[in-house]
């Protein structure tokens, strides 16, 4: 081959010169093929190369988690020698370990002690690759002193591997992190081949030495290596052997190959600017965009590893450093975060690290087992016994989408077309020492190499877009496994909520909700509900009022999170967040809501239901539980550590009516809307029924017995079988007649009437009339009896009932007259205008209330002096109230209760004017205020007009001015069935504590205590049974 020809021939069908592609001639191809197909018997006999597949050979030695690769063809030249000194015979490579052979031990004895000069070979490094034969000869002459200093023999020995740890050279390299691997390429076979002794081989060797050294610094921090480095190291070995015939064993200590997220970031950042990228064992695609970086890397290797070589540092390298300052600063930050070496390598500057990080690895797919110690594993001392295993990727071709590996070496901008280098491939071979210790897989990196049989060369103008490169890199890294410590959370877990971290590490969580239910109140969302350790903020709107409710977490008792499991297609959310606050916190909630509907007596106000916009994610649920655990630990509520299930929460409010708790009324109106329990418990039993464990079986039973006029109560043990209530199916039996004979007008009470005295039953008219007669005859004073009259419960019903017009005798009568004719006989023996108080029980729509006609004989209000008896009685009652010596006997019910307001107003009227007011009026005493009061008052006024005409024979108008209607405040019922009981208690309290002063306003809120109502039904039952026994004894005697 002509030495004057500028450039070198590639081992391929293409030659790249100054950015242009030229086809090589068939003669050149045949010559290259002949050189690459020479086989060696020594290699076949002593090396395991034929056992490996592919067309490439790698030597890999595990040392401090590093990889050393050496080509078996690097026996052409040592480091540099004149072409005339090359031997005439061809070299053969023997693969062996110096620790295993006698040749290795003999060679170790011949090694010089001053091994520092071996590194001086890097002084021959120039700023750019030599492109002419003259430069090649000068480079080889520089290498002569090195080989002479080593006293190597003239013969060409076989290449052997030296354990670098046993030499001073190795001890020196152990102090600094060096390259991770050196790839030596081979394109023909794993066997030794005959080397050319021509001048071209020498020239190529000299040129390859420079380029090899330029990329060693880049291998220090990259997970993959370039194929041209392998070719240059192979040429380096051939140059050494052609010089003196002796070998210069040069071992490079690999650097740890543990990478963290910082390296990956640099890797992908540089990958976005690359051209067409593919993968192979020993070939690397260098980007044309980074020509300056490659050139800088070629001229910077020795300077970065040997501080003495600063004299040879070129000015071009300094300029390149200034141009790449921006990129280097970014890469320096990532490298500083990634590689925290305790002892930085001597002469290795941050700039060189930045340059190394910019090269893209395109033929190796790494599968790191990332751990917390990966950043520290870069230390040479800690990783000296670690190994890096290289294996052939069996299925990586599919991940690469069937593309063949391509390599492209772009010449730097300067017209140096002679820098085209020979690219050869090598098959990986694993070589390790027995003394290296066990392999540490924790910090190791598995390299998957893509073998390639066909070699293609890409032009620098063929580009690969960034999306394609990203897709290629992702496809190659599909098998990468990263530990959970460094792996970010799954974005699929994200939902509508947002977690806001606080600088004080306070937990905070937001949910989007649609509705909130608090007691009777239903509100719509006006933002997100916020959970913190100190408060829960709920913004919502009721009608037109916007409210921001803040719940103190110190008052939180339990919480629940329920999701429905049904598969209906309703658009409504089935995620409910439940909060249970303490009862003593209801006053604060009512103050914030400014809503009187929130009564503190109702248990329903303790429950807050939040209808979420959508079910929460698992990450949000864990965050919510953490917040609740913090609240529970702070406030001592250990029950907050776990949410309350639906089956345990539903019995708390299942007995409440939908009118009291809006959640049951709006959300749980349909069975499908009920939240389901996350488990099989909800499927086994309905939500409306408590579990069997909650049902307590009675241990005894009450028995009521009546025999021979005696009524007895006994207790017996609980029966084995379930007992059912047995109602009396016999004939109706009259228990009493009140008043008893011989008094006329007695009212009979039967055993069926006693049934309405059960809890939850409405009182019938018989019980109402009986007890009113009893109060008038037994409880009222004689004076009140003379001044009072009580109509039957049937009076008002008869007064207002509708009759057929055919039954009317005189159709010319008015409506009021016709009504009066229906009840005209009710007062034939009494003149109601001689009475002060007329009691009219009214039943409308199954609701009882009382109407009291006061002073019907008066036409206007009259003020009179208090009688002595009344004044003295009032003073006695006042003193009893002040001394709190009131008798609360439920049977006698002789207690006198007066309100403070009434007492104060009455005392004022007595002390100052000492007058009492008698006002004609109609008092409406209603415990529920649910009836049409105006119609009732108007009907009674019309009745009084007609009755006045009948009794007084004159006309008098009863209007709103002379017969006003008053509705004083009285004790109210707390259920829907005690209206009749309250009516009876109103009359009883009136007889015990009559209203003597009708000066407005009239306050009767504290007329009687509530516990009197609770025992009233039982008192009436006992009274009827007592009278029954008395009448039975009287009849028997």
Swiss-Prot record:
Sequence ranges of Basic residues compositional bias: 1-10, 289-299
Bias-annotated ranges (Basic and acidic residues): 310-320, 330-340, 879-890
Phosphoprotein among keywords: yes
One Gene Ontology molecular-function label: SUMO-specific endopeptidase activity
Pfam families, alphabetized: Peptidase_C48
The protein's Enzyme Commission number: 3.4.22.-
Compartment list: Cytoplasm
Gene Ontology CC terms: cytoplasm; nucleus; postsynaptic cytosol; presynaptic cytosol
Protease: region residues: 747-1037
In-chain residues carrying the UniProt-annotated modification Phosphoserine: 12-13, 25, 189, 432-433
Composition bias type Low complexity, residue spans: 381-399, 898-910
Alphabetized UniProt keyword annotations: Cytoplasm, Hydrolase, Immunity, Innate immunity, Phosphoprotein, Protease, Ubl conjugation pathway
Bridged cysteine pairs (disulfide): none
Main location class: cytoplasm
Active site: residue positions: 847, 926, 979
InterPro entries per UniProt: Papain-like_cys_pep_sf (IPR038765), Peptidase_C48_C (IPR003653), Sentrin-specific_protease (IPR051947)
Statement: the UniProt record of this protein carries the keyword Protease: yes
Region named Disordered: 1-28, 182-420, 873-910
Biased composition (Polar residues): 182-211, 253-263, 300-309
Domain of life: Eukaryota
GO biological process: antiviral innate immune response; protein desumoylation; proteolysis
Family stated for the protein in its record: Belongs to the peptidase C48 family.
Its biological purpose: Protease that acts as a positive regulator of the cGAS-STING pathway by catalyzing desumoylation of CGAS. Desumoylation of CGAS promotes DNA-binding activity of CGAS, subsequent oligomerization and activation. Deconjugates SUMO2 and SUMO3 from targeted proteins, but not SUMO1. Catalyzes the deconjugation of poly-SUMO2 and poly-SUMO3 chains. Has very low efficiency in processing full-length SUMO proteins to their mature forms.
Protein name as annotated: Sentrin-specific protease 7
Organism: Rattus norvegicus
């Amino acid at each position: 081959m002509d030495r004057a020809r500028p450039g070198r021939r590639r081992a391929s069908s293409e030659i790249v010169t100054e950015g242009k592609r030229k086809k090589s001639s068939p003669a050149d191809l045949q010559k290259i093929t002949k050189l690459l197909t020479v086989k060696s018997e020594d290699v076949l006999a002593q090396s395991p190369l034929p056992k490996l597949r592919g067309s490439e050979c790698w030597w890999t030695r595990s040392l401090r988690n590093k990889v050393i690769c050496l080509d078996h063809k690097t026996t052409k030249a040592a480091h540099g020698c004149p072409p005339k000194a090359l031997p005439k015979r061809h070299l053969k490579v023997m693969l062996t370990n110096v620790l295993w052979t006698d040749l290795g031990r003999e060679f170790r004895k011949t090694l010089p002690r001053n091994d520092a000069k071996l590194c001086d070979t890097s002084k021959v490094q120039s700023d750019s690759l030599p492109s002419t034969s003259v430069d090649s000869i000068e480079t080889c002459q520089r290498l002569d002193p090195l080989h002479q200093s080593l006293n190597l023999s003239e013969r060409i020995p076989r290449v052997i591997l030296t354990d670098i740890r046993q030499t001073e050279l190795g001890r020196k390299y152990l102090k600094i992190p060096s390259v991770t691997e050196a790839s030596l390429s081979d394109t023909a076979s794993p066997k030794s081949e005959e080397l050319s002794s021509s001048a071209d081989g020498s020239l190529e060797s000299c040129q390859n030495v420079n380029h090899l050294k330029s990329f060693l610094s880049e291998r220090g921090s990259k997970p993959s290596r370039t194929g041209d480095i392998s070719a240059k190291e192979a040429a380096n070995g051939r140059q050494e052997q052609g010089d003196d015939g002796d070998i210069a064993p040069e071992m490079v200590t690999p650097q740890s190959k543990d990478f963290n997220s910082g390296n990956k970031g640099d890797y992908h950042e540089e990958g976005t600017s690359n051209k067409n990228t593919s993968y192979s064992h020993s070939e690397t695609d260098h980007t044309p965009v980074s020509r300056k970086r490659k050139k800088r890397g070629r001229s910077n290797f020795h300077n970065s590893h040997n501080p003495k070589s600063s004299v040879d540092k070129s000015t071009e390298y300094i300029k390149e450093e200034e141009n790449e300052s921006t990129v280097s600063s970014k890469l320096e930050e990532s490298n500083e975060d990634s590689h925290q070496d305790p002892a930085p390598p001597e002469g290795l500057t941050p700039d060189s690290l930045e340059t190394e990080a910019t090269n893209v690895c395109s033929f190796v797919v790494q599968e790191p087992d990332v751990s917390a110690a990966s950043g520290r594993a870069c230390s040479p001392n800690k990783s000296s016994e670690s190994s890096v295993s290289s294996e052939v990727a069996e299925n990586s071709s599919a991940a690469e989408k069937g593309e063949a590996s391509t390599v492209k070496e772009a010449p730097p901008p300067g017209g140096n077309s002679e820098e085209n280098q020979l690219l050869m491939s090598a098959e990986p071979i694993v070589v390790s020492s027995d003394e290296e210790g066990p392999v540490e897989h924790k910090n190791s990196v598995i390299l998957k190499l893509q073998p390639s049989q066909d070699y293609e060369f890409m032009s620098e103008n063929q580009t690969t877009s960034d999306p394609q490169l990203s897709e290629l890199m992702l496809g190659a890294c599909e098998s990468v496994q990263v530990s959970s410590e460094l792996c970010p959370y799954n974005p699929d877990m994200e939902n509508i909520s947002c977690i806001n971290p606080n600088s004080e590490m306070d937990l905070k969580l937001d949910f989007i909700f649609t509705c909130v239910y608090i007691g009777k109140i239903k509100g719509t969302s006006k933002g997100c509900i916020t959970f913190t350790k100190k408060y829960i903020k709920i913004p919502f709107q009721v009608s037109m009022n916007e409210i921001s409710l803040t719940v103190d977490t110190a008052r939180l008792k339990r919480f629940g999170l329920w999701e429905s499991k049904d598969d209906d297609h309703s658009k409504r959310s089935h995620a409910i967040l439940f909060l249970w606050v303490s009862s003593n916190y209801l006053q604060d909630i009512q103050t914030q809501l400014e809503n009187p509907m929130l009564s503190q007596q109702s248990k329903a106000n303790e429950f807050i239901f939040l209808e979420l916009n959508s079910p929460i994610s698992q990450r949000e649920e864990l965050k919510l539980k953490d917040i609740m655990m913090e609240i529970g630990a702070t406030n001592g509520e250990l029950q907050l550590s776990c949410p309350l299930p639906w089956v345990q929460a539903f019995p708390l409010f299942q007995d409440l009516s939908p009118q009291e708790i809006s959640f049951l009324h709006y959300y749980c109106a349909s069975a499908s809307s009920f939240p389901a329990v996350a488990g099989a418990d909800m499927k086994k039993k309905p939500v409306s029924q408590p579990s069997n464990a909650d049902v307590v079986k009675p241990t005894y039973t009450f028995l009521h017995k009546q025999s021979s006029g005696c009524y007895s109560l006994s207790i017996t043990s609980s029966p084995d079988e379930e007992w059912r209530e047995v109602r009396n199916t016999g004939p109706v039996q009259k228990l009493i007649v009140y008043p008893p004979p011989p008094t006329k007008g007695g009212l009979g009470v039967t055993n069926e009437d006693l049934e309405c005295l059960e809890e939850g039953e409405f009182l019938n008219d018989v019980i109402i009339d009986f007890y009113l007669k009893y109060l008038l005859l037994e409880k009222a004073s004689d004076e009140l009896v003379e001044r009072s009259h009580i109509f039957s419960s049937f009076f008002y019903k008869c007064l207002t009932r509708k009759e057929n017009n055919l039954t009317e005798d005189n159709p010319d009568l008015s409506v009021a007259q016709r009504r009066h004719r229906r009840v005209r006989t009710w007062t034939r023996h009494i003149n109601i205008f001689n009475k002060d108080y007329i009691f009219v029980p009214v039943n409308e729509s199954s609701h009882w209330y009382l109407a009291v006609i006061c002073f019907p004989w008066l036409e206007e209000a009259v003020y009179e002096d208090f009688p002595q008896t009344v004044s003295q009685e009032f003073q006695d009652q006042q003193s009893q109230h002040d001394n709190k010596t009131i008798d609360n006997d439920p049977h006698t019910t002789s207690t006198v209760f007066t309100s403070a307001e009434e007492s104060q107003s009455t005392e004022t009227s007595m002390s100052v004017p000492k007058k009492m007011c008698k006002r004609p009026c109609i008092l409406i005493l209603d415990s529920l205020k649910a009836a049409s009061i105006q119609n009732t008052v108007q009907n009674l006024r019309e009745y009084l007009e007609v009755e006045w005409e009948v009794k007084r024979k004159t006309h008098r108008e009863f209007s709103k001015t002379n017969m006003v209607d008053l509705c004083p405040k009285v004790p109210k019922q707390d259920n829907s069935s005690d209206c009749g009981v309250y009516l009876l208690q109103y009359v009883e309290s009136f007889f015990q504590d009559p209203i003597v002063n009708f000066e407005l306003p009239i306050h009767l809120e504290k007329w009687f205590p509530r516990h009197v109502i609770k025992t009233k039904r039982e008192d009436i039952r006992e009274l009827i049974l007592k009278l029954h026994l008395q009448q039975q004894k009287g009849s028997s005697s």
